[in-house]
Protein backbone atom coordinates (compact mmCIF):
# COMPACT_ATOMS: atom_id res chain seq x y z
CA UNK A 1 0.00 0.00 0.00
CA UNK A 2 2.89 2.29 0.63
CA UNK A 3 4.09 1.83 -2.92
CA UNK A 4 0.65 2.61 -4.33
CA UNK A 5 0.41 5.77 -2.24
CA UNK A 6 3.80 6.96 -3.45
CA UNK A 7 2.79 6.37 -7.08
CA UNK A 8 -0.48 8.24 -6.63
CA UNK A 9 1.16 11.38 -5.27
CA UNK A 10 2.50 12.74 -8.61
CA UNK A 11 -0.82 11.88 -10.22
CA UNK A 12 -2.60 13.99 -7.65
CA UNK A 13 -0.22 16.88 -8.20
CA UNK A 14 -0.93 16.85 -11.96
CA UNK A 15 -4.67 16.32 -12.11
CA UNK A 16 -6.04 17.71 -8.87
CA UNK A 17 -5.55 19.62 -5.67
CA UNK A 18 -6.42 16.90 -3.14
CA UNK A 19 -6.40 13.15 -3.14
CA UNK A 20 -10.12 13.13 -2.40
CA UNK A 21 -10.86 14.88 -5.67
CA UNK A 22 -8.63 12.56 -7.72
CA UNK A 23 -9.73 9.13 -6.46
CA UNK A 24 -12.19 7.45 -4.11
CA UNK A 25 -11.54 7.29 -0.38
CA UNK A 26 -10.60 3.91 1.16
CA UNK A 27 -13.76 4.06 3.25
CA UNK A 28 -15.91 4.23 0.18
CA UNK A 29 -14.20 1.23 -1.34
CA UNK A 30 -14.83 -0.78 1.75
CA UNK A 31 -18.46 0.19 1.85
CA UNK A 32 -18.79 -0.71 -1.86
CA UNK A 33 -20.07 2.67 -2.99
CA UNK A 34 -18.29 4.28 -6.03
CA UNK A 35 -18.00 8.00 -5.97
CA UNK A 36 -17.30 10.01 -9.18
CA UNK A 37 -14.70 12.74 -8.97
CA UNK A 38 -14.06 15.64 -11.40
CA UNK A 39 -10.51 15.83 -12.82
CA UNK A 40 -9.29 19.44 -13.02
CA UNK A 41 -6.09 20.22 -15.02
CA UNK A 42 -3.29 22.02 -13.28
CA UNK A 43 -2.98 24.88 -15.80
CA UNK A 44 -6.59 26.00 -15.20
CA UNK A 45 -6.05 26.59 -11.49
CA UNK A 46 -2.69 28.30 -11.91
CA UNK A 47 -2.37 32.06 -12.37
CA UNK A 48 -1.07 33.61 -15.62
CA UNK A 49 2.58 32.87 -16.09
CA UNK A 50 5.16 30.77 -17.88
CA UNK A 51 3.45 27.49 -16.89
CA UNK A 52 -0.06 28.49 -17.96
CA UNK A 53 -0.01 26.42 -21.18
CA UNK A 54 2.02 23.54 -22.50
CA UNK A 55 3.26 25.61 -25.43
CA UNK A 56 4.65 28.27 -23.10
CA UNK A 57 6.33 25.64 -21.00
CA UNK A 58 7.99 24.13 -24.06
CA UNK A 59 8.91 27.58 -25.33
CA UNK A 60 10.62 28.42 -22.07
CA UNK A 61 12.88 25.39 -22.39
CA UNK A 62 13.38 25.69 -26.17
CA UNK A 63 13.48 29.39 -27.10
CA UNK A 64 12.76 30.09 -30.78
CA UNK A 65 15.00 32.81 -32.24
CA UNK A 66 13.73 34.93 -35.16
CA UNK A 67 15.12 33.90 -38.53
CA UNK A 68 17.49 36.22 -40.31
CA UNK A 69 15.98 38.43 -43.00
CA UNK A 70 17.17 38.38 -46.62
CA UNK A 71 19.49 41.27 -47.45
CA UNK A 72 19.25 42.84 -50.92
CA UNK A 73 22.14 44.80 -52.36
CA UNK A 74 22.02 47.27 -55.24
CA UNK A 75 23.80 46.12 -58.38
CA UNK A 76 26.68 48.35 -59.46
CA UNK A 77 26.64 50.00 -62.85
CA UNK A 78 28.80 48.51 -65.67
CA UNK A 79 31.10 51.53 -65.48
CA UNK A 80 32.00 50.76 -61.86
CA UNK A 81 32.76 47.06 -62.38
CA UNK A 82 36.47 47.66 -62.90
CA UNK A 83 36.81 50.34 -60.22
CA UNK A 84 36.07 48.12 -57.21
CA UNK A 85 38.50 45.39 -56.21
CA UNK A 86 36.02 43.59 -53.94
CA UNK A 87 34.12 40.69 -55.54
CA UNK A 88 30.44 41.11 -56.23
CA UNK A 89 27.98 39.50 -53.81
CA UNK A 90 25.43 37.27 -55.59
CA UNK A 91 21.81 38.32 -55.12
CA UNK A 92 18.41 37.09 -56.22
CA UNK A 93 18.90 38.90 -59.52
CA UNK A 94 21.60 36.37 -60.41
CA UNK A 95 19.18 33.50 -59.85
CA UNK A 96 16.55 35.19 -62.00
CA UNK A 97 19.05 35.74 -64.77
CA UNK A 98 20.20 32.11 -64.70
CA UNK A 99 16.59 30.90 -64.81
CA UNK A 100 15.98 33.09 -67.84
CA UNK A 101 18.84 31.46 -69.75
CA UNK A 102 17.66 29.10 -72.49
CA UNK A 103 20.57 26.70 -72.20
CA UNK A 104 20.36 26.15 -68.45
CA UNK A 105 17.05 24.28 -68.28
CA UNK A 106 17.85 22.75 -64.89
CA UNK A 107 17.20 26.13 -63.24
CA UNK A 108 13.57 26.22 -64.35
CA UNK A 109 10.57 25.08 -62.36
CA UNK A 110 7.40 23.34 -63.51
CA UNK A 111 5.34 26.33 -62.42
CA UNK A 112 7.35 28.64 -64.66
CA UNK A 113 4.71 30.59 -66.63
CA UNK A 114 7.09 32.80 -68.52
CA UNK A 115 5.79 34.23 -71.86
CA UNK A 116 7.12 33.21 -75.24
CA UNK A 117 10.73 33.69 -76.15
CA UNK A 118 10.19 36.33 -78.85
CA UNK A 119 7.95 38.41 -76.57
CA UNK A 120 9.96 38.21 -73.36
CA UNK A 121 12.40 41.06 -72.78
CA UNK A 122 14.37 41.08 -69.52
CA UNK A 123 14.38 44.28 -67.53
CA UNK A 124 17.65 46.17 -66.99
CA UNK A 125 17.80 44.92 -63.40
CA UNK A 126 17.68 41.28 -64.49
CA UNK A 127 20.29 41.60 -67.21
CA UNK A 128 23.69 40.90 -65.71
CA UNK A 129 26.98 41.62 -67.39
CA UNK A 130 28.33 38.15 -66.77
CA UNK A 131 30.87 38.31 -69.58
CA UNK A 132 32.16 41.74 -68.69
CA UNK A 133 35.77 40.66 -69.18
CA UNK A 134 35.11 39.59 -72.79
CA UNK A 135 35.69 42.50 -75.22
CA UNK A 136 32.69 43.85 -77.08
CA UNK A 137 33.32 42.95 -80.71
CA UNK A 138 30.33 44.89 -82.04
CA UNK A 139 31.73 48.20 -80.85
CA UNK A 140 35.05 47.46 -82.54
CA UNK A 141 33.30 46.57 -85.80
CA UNK A 142 31.36 49.83 -85.74
CA UNK A 143 34.56 51.80 -85.09
CA UNK A 144 36.34 50.07 -87.96
CA UNK A 145 33.39 50.79 -90.27
CA UNK A 146 33.51 54.47 -89.30
CA UNK A 147 37.22 54.52 -90.08
CA UNK A 148 36.61 52.91 -93.47
CA UNK A 149 33.97 55.47 -94.47
CA UNK A 150 36.42 58.20 -95.62
CA UNK A 151 38.27 55.70 -97.80
CA UNK A 152 35.03 54.50 -99.35
CA UNK A 153 33.93 58.06 -100.04
CA UNK A 154 37.27 58.84 -101.70
CA UNK A 155 36.96 55.80 -103.95
CA UNK A 156 33.42 56.80 -104.89
CA UNK A 157 34.50 60.37 -105.64
CA UNK A 158 37.30 59.13 -107.91
CA UNK A 159 34.86 56.90 -109.79
CA UNK A 160 32.44 59.81 -110.18
CA UNK A 161 35.22 62.01 -111.52
CA UNK A 162 36.13 59.39 -114.12
CA UNK A 163 32.51 59.17 -115.25
CA UNK A 164 32.28 62.94 -115.43
CA UNK A 165 35.40 63.10 -117.57
CA UNK A 166 33.85 60.63 -120.02
CA UNK A 167 30.63 62.66 -120.13
CA UNK A 168 32.62 65.85 -120.67
CA UNK A 169 34.47 64.38 -123.62
CA UNK A 170 31.23 63.13 -125.16
CA UNK A 171 29.58 66.55 -124.82
CA UNK A 172 32.60 68.23 -126.41
CA UNK A 173 32.53 65.79 -129.34
CA UNK A 174 28.82 66.35 -129.89
CA UNK A 175 29.19 70.14 -129.91
CA UNK A 176 32.22 69.98 -132.20
CA UNK A 177 30.58 67.49 -134.56
CA UNK A 178 27.42 69.58 -134.88
CA UNK A 179 29.42 72.71 -135.64
CA UNK A 180 31.58 70.91 -138.24
CA UNK A 181 28.61 69.30 -139.98
CA UNK A 182 26.69 72.59 -140.12
CA UNK A 183 29.68 74.60 -141.38
CA UNK A 184 30.58 72.25 -144.23
CA UNK A 185 26.97 71.89 -145.41
CA UNK A 186 24.57 69.05 -145.71
CA UNK A 187 25.83 68.01 -149.21
CA UNK A 188 29.45 67.36 -148.32
CA UNK A 189 28.80 65.18 -145.23
CA UNK A 190 26.10 62.45 -145.01
CA UNK A 191 23.67 62.57 -142.13
CA UNK A 192 24.33 59.09 -140.70
CA UNK A 193 28.13 59.35 -140.57
CA UNK A 194 29.67 58.89 -137.13
CA UNK A 195 31.11 61.97 -135.45
CA UNK A 196 34.38 60.27 -134.59
CA UNK A 197 34.93 59.36 -138.24
CA UNK A 198 34.32 62.91 -139.51
CA UNK A 199 36.84 64.60 -137.26
CA UNK A 200 40.05 62.99 -138.65
CA UNK A 201 38.87 63.37 -142.28
CA UNK A 202 38.22 67.11 -142.27
CA UNK A 203 40.48 68.23 -139.43
CA UNK A 204 43.99 68.24 -141.00
CA UNK A 205 42.87 69.53 -144.46
CA UNK A 206 42.27 73.07 -143.19
CA UNK A 207 44.35 75.66 -141.44
CA UNK A 208 43.72 76.04 -137.73
CA UNK A 209 42.03 79.42 -137.33
CA UNK A 210 39.59 78.42 -134.55
CA UNK A 211 40.25 76.62 -131.28
CA UNK A 212 38.00 75.33 -128.51
CA UNK A 213 39.79 74.93 -125.18
CA UNK A 214 38.19 73.06 -122.30
CA UNK A 215 39.85 73.71 -118.99
CA UNK A 216 39.04 73.79 -115.31
CA UNK A 217 37.44 76.91 -113.88
CA UNK A 218 37.68 78.21 -110.37
CA UNK A 219 34.66 78.73 -108.15
CA UNK A 220 34.67 82.47 -108.83
CA UNK A 221 33.25 81.89 -112.31
CA UNK A 222 30.07 80.35 -110.90
CA UNK A 223 28.87 83.76 -109.74
CA UNK A 224 28.88 85.10 -113.30
CA UNK A 225 25.99 82.84 -114.35
CA UNK A 226 23.42 84.86 -112.41
CA UNK A 227 24.50 88.08 -114.17
CA UNK A 228 23.39 86.82 -117.55
CA UNK A 229 20.84 89.06 -119.31
CA UNK A 230 18.53 88.59 -122.29
CA UNK A 231 19.89 91.67 -124.10
CA UNK A 232 23.38 90.17 -124.43
CA UNK A 233 21.81 86.96 -125.76
CA UNK A 234 20.01 88.83 -128.59
CA UNK A 235 23.13 90.81 -129.54
CA UNK A 236 25.25 87.67 -129.66
CA UNK A 237 22.77 85.84 -131.90
CA UNK A 238 22.69 88.72 -134.42
CA UNK A 239 26.48 88.92 -134.58
CA UNK A 240 26.78 85.16 -134.95
CA UNK A 241 24.28 85.07 -137.82
CA UNK A 242 26.27 87.70 -139.75
CA UNK A 243 29.49 85.81 -139.21
CA UNK A 244 27.91 82.55 -140.33
CA UNK A 245 26.90 84.03 -143.68
CA UNK A 246 30.51 84.90 -144.48
CA UNK A 247 31.56 81.50 -143.16
CA UNK A 248 29.35 79.69 -145.69
CA UNK A 249 30.96 81.60 -148.60
CA UNK A 250 34.54 81.02 -147.47
CA UNK A 251 34.70 77.24 -146.98
CA UNK A 252 38.44 77.07 -147.69
CA UNK A 253 39.24 79.24 -144.67
CA UNK A 254 37.44 77.13 -141.96
CA UNK A 255 39.09 74.69 -139.53
CA UNK A 256 38.57 73.18 -136.08
CA UNK A 257 41.01 72.22 -133.33
CA UNK A 258 39.76 70.47 -130.22
CA UNK A 259 41.82 70.11 -127.04
CA UNK A 260 40.89 68.79 -123.64
CA UNK A 261 42.42 69.14 -120.24
CA UNK A 262 43.47 66.09 -118.23
CA UNK A 263 41.98 66.93 -114.81
CA UNK A 264 38.27 67.37 -114.05
CA UNK A 265 36.78 68.44 -110.76
CA UNK A 266 33.11 67.51 -110.45
CA UNK A 267 29.71 67.69 -112.12
CA UNK A 268 29.68 71.47 -112.13
CA UNK A 269 32.88 71.31 -114.14
CA UNK A 270 30.81 70.46 -117.24
CA UNK A 271 29.16 73.87 -117.17
CA UNK A 272 32.41 75.52 -116.13
CA UNK A 273 34.28 74.01 -119.08
CA UNK A 274 31.62 75.17 -121.53
CA UNK A 275 31.72 78.66 -120.00
CA UNK A 276 35.49 78.80 -120.32
CA UNK A 277 35.68 77.80 -123.99
CA UNK A 278 37.91 80.22 -125.85
CA UNK A 279 36.45 81.29 -129.20
CA UNK A 280 39.01 83.24 -131.24
CA UNK A 281 37.98 84.37 -134.67
CA UNK A 282 39.29 87.28 -136.64
CA UNK A 283 37.78 87.38 -140.13
CA UNK A 284 39.69 90.54 -141.11
CA UNK A 285 43.08 88.74 -140.85
CA UNK A 286 42.59 85.32 -142.47
CA UNK A 287 45.95 83.70 -141.67
CA UNK A 288 46.34 84.98 -138.11
CA UNK A 289 44.97 83.51 -134.88
CA UNK A 290 44.09 86.07 -132.26
CA UNK A 291 42.98 84.52 -128.96
CA UNK A 292 40.20 86.38 -127.23
CA UNK A 293 39.21 85.63 -123.62
CA UNK A 294 35.61 86.63 -123.10
CA UNK A 295 33.16 86.35 -120.26
CA UNK A 296 32.07 82.72 -119.54
CA UNK A 297 28.39 83.69 -119.71
CA UNK A 298 28.82 85.18 -123.17
CA UNK A 299 30.90 82.21 -124.31
CA UNK A 300 28.27 79.64 -123.39
CA UNK A 301 25.53 81.71 -125.02
CA UNK A 302 27.57 82.02 -128.22
CA UNK A 303 28.36 78.32 -128.34
CA UNK A 304 24.73 77.33 -127.86
CA UNK A 305 23.47 79.81 -130.43
CA UNK A 306 26.16 78.64 -132.86
CA UNK A 307 25.02 75.08 -132.42
CA UNK A 308 21.36 75.81 -133.18
CA UNK A 309 21.95 78.53 -135.79
CA UNK A 310 24.33 76.46 -137.91
CA UNK A 311 21.81 73.64 -138.16
CA UNK A 312 19.40 75.91 -140.15
CA UNK A 313 21.43 77.91 -142.72
CA UNK A 314 18.23 79.06 -144.47
CA UNK A 315 17.08 80.90 -141.36
CA UNK A 316 20.39 82.75 -141.21
CA UNK A 317 19.92 84.25 -144.69
CA UNK A 318 16.29 85.17 -144.11
CA UNK A 319 17.05 87.01 -140.88
CA UNK A 320 19.56 89.29 -142.63
From Swiss-Prot:
Protein's UniProt keywords contain Membrane: yes
Residue stretches of biased makeup (Basic and acidic residues): 9-30
Places the protein is found: Mitochondrion outer membrane
Main location: mitochondrion
Any GO BP: aerobic respiration
Family: Belongs to the MTFR1 family.
Protein name: Mitochondrial fission regulator 1-like-B
Gene: mtfr1l-b
Amino acid sequence: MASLGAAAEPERSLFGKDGAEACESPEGRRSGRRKRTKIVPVWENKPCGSSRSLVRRIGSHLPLKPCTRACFEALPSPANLYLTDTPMVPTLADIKWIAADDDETYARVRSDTRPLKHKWRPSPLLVMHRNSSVPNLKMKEEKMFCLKKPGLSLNKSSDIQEELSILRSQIARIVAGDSVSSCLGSDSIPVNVDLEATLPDYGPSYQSTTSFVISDITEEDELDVSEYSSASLVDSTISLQRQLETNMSDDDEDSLCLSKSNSFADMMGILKDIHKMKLNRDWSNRNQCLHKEEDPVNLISEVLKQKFALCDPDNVKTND
